[in-house]
């Protein structure tokens, strides 16, 4: 093996793998807070969400047992929502009740936030409020 080739192999082995570099650049424990308020603007509950991974999305699709985006989204909500102490806010079986008994606009607001389309407050900011 030529010396330049050996040097290239040594440099590569000391460098971090691309996948590790990319994955290590994001903190999957960094939670965002959603304040659920009632029609009078009073706080009902604070929900917290970690970033969604592709594996999370696939698990929600599998548990929904359908390609219906609304059902998948509510399953994702039940799977990802946490209380402040990190415990799960919902059981997977709660998806049906949320779809049946929660006003559509409220469920939409929570799910849009979950998917990063609503207003965001990071946990650091939330604790400073």
Predicted regions mapped to residue ranges:
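Short, surface-exposed, charged amphipathic helix/loop patches that serve as local interaction elements
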Residues: 40-129
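Short, charged/polar N-terminal "headpieces" of proteins
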Residues: 1-66, 128-129
């Amino acid at each position: 093996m030529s010396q330049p080739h050996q040097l290239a192999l040594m440099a590569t082995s000391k460098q971090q793998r691309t996948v590790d570099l990319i994955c290590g650049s994001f903190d999957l424990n960094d939670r965002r807070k959603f304040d659920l308020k009632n029609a009078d603007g009073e706080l009902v509950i604070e929900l917290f969400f970690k970033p969604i991974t592709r594996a999370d999305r696939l698990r929600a699709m599998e548990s929904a047992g359908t390609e219906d985006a609304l059902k998948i989204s509510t399953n994702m909500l039940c799977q990802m929502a946490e209380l402040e102490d990190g415990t799960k806010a919902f059981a997977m079986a709660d998806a049906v009740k949320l779809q049946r008994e929660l006003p559509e606009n409220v469920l939409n607001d929570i799910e849009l936030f979950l998917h990063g389309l609503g207003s965001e407050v990071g946990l650091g900011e939330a604790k400073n409020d």
